[in-house]
Structures are given as structure tokens and as C-alpha cells.
Curated annotation (Swiss-Prot):
Gene: MT-CYB
Family note: Belongs to the cytochrome b family.
Protein name: Cytochrome b
Organism lineage string: Eukaryota, Metazoa, Chordata, Craniata, Vertebrata
Pfam families linked: Cytochrom_B_C, Cytochrome_B
Residues involved in heme b b566 binding: 98, 197
Amino acid sequence: MSTNLRKTHPLAKIINNSFIDLPSPSNISAWWNFGSLLGTCLILQTITGIFLAMHYSPDISLAFSSVAHITRDVQYGWLIRNMHANGASLFFMCIYLHIGRGIYYGSYLYKETWNTGTTLLLLTMATAFVGYVLPWGQMSFWGATVITNLLSAIPYVGNTLVQWIWGGFSVDNATLTRFFTFHFLLPFTIMGLTVMHLLFLHETGSNNPTGLNSNTDKIPFHPYFSYKDLLGLILMLALLLTLTLFFPNLLGDPDNFTPANPLSTPPHIKPEWYFLFAYAILRSIPNKLGGVLALLMSILVLFLMPALHTSKQRTTQFRPLTQILFWSLIANLLVLTWIGGQPVENPFIIIGQVASILYFSILLILMPIAGMIENKMLT
């Protein structure tokens, strides 16, 4: 009897155990598609990014015009650039849906997988931030100035740290060069961490909508979920191409079509849509250091999710109180995203402050209490 190379070859064996013969719960829904979509996004962003880097010049006198040159003169440069810019938006859309699924179905109880995933989110946010600076438009320049300046709120070492990151006394050529370096380097770090993320996941196997042990009912990943993932992939690419080909600048900022000018501040400095919720939390606190801490905590709170789980049940599927809180949290995040894009004036200030307090209250106080109440209702 001939041995199956797929199951014996050292390299093929790894791929086989991860993507072909992987035992998967039979009842995982479309919410479990986002992992593969994120992997696809990462590959797509890396490929388009490498092609852009071939034509980009990380110098303040050339950066803006090199991006214009890519979109005008390079073969399909407009397509590569628009796919890279909108691909980032789609990447974050998938990340947020993936995290939302993790919170709803209690996937955070796989602590190692959850912690590597949250670290991946932080790295992706850092990559997106330094990448946004590279076209050297007005919003790139002022976004870099405002966000890096937040570090000056750190007591004692703040100002030194900011100047160290800038490579001078303001955002200048040295800053752009190092941001380009980080933007090129970080995705490969993300890839390494993604492998760890999968490694930890395959130690435990996937969670499922019921939150119960599914060892008695597993099916092979291929063909069932490989085709299901392929459908998700086709839908995602359709959305990406629709954005890229019909509405390439829909999610961008018009200010970034103006070259960076240190002498003229844009009327409203705001980041890309996927950072607006955190930006709203930052702005809702009148104290600089307090704002920076709230901004950090808005993401780092995810690390606390396993410790805040009080329910006897894993998922939110059969927990009406927590369900109400979960969807309130989603609505609250949408409100924060809207507020982040609005000017700092009434009534937006107070709405932002209420939404920020609610965000932390739901995650840190109300959800654990709801879990305990639901436990009481069970007995």
C-alpha cells in the first residue's frame, strides 16, 4: 500500500493538519469565516505594499509626488494603490467583526489565542498608523504630529521620547524614513504572530456557537469549510473591488490630496474611520495624560476579557441580559465612531463623554454583573 505523501511529507503534513484534515466543529457559522479572510487580507496587503514600495520614495520632497507618479504613470499603479488603501479598511472591518464574534461566543476563554490576537490588533493598528503618514499629505503630516505628540504626556520622559521618535524637533524627513521602515517591517512581524495565533488555536480546536465541547461531532476542514471560506473570500473581494473601482476615495480624507504643509493646520484633524472610536475616547477626556490612558485602555481592555467572564455558560447565545449589553456595546461603538469624525463642539462633546463612560461600563462592570445574575436565574 502506497503512503499518502500529504500525510507523511514534513511540510505537506503541517499544511494537511492545518487546512485539510483539521477536525472542525460541524456547526460553526459564517462568523467563523473571518480568520481566513484576515489571512487573505494580510497576503493581499503585503503583495500590493511590496509593489508600491518599488515605486515609492520615502523623502519629504519626493513622497507626495511619488504617490502621484504611482497613480498616474505606473502600469496599473492606480489599481494597486487603491486596493492597498481600501484593503486596509476591509482588513479592519474583518478584524472588528472577528473580535465581535470572539466576544459574543466567548472565544476569549482560549487565553493564548485571544492574547496573541489582541497583540495582532495592536500591531496592525501601529502598521496602519505609520502607513497613513507615507503619502505625506496634510492629514498624513498632522495626524503623525498629533498622535506622536500624545507621548509627551508621559511624565518625565515624554518630551525626550517624542523627539526620539521624530528624529528631531518636529515631524520631518527622519520621521518619514523611519515610518516607512516600520511600515515595511511590521507586516512580517504580524505574519509570524499569525502563525503563533493559529498554532495556539489548533492546540484547542475551534470554539462553536453553542460553546459546548464539540469533540463528538467533528468534520474535516476540507472540503466543507474550505469551500465555505472560498464563498466568503469571493464576497469580500467583490466588496473590495467595488470600493476600489467605483468609490476609491470614499473612505479617504480630501485633505490628503494637499501636500503636507507644516505652516497650515487642517480645520479638523481626524484619523481614518477605523480609529475614530478610539480617537473619540481620547478627545472625551479634557486631561492629556488621562486621554492617552483612556485611548490605550480602550484596546487593552480586550486583554481583561477572560478575567471578566463570570457566567457558567461560555457563549452569549443563551444569555438574554448579556445579549442586550453586547448589542448596546456595538451601538455605542458606532456612536463613538460617528463622534470621532465630528468637530469638538456641543452637543458632540457630551455625547462622546457619555459614550466613552458607557463603553468602559458595559465591558468592565455591567457584563460581569449580568453574567452573575444569569447564573442566579439558572439555579
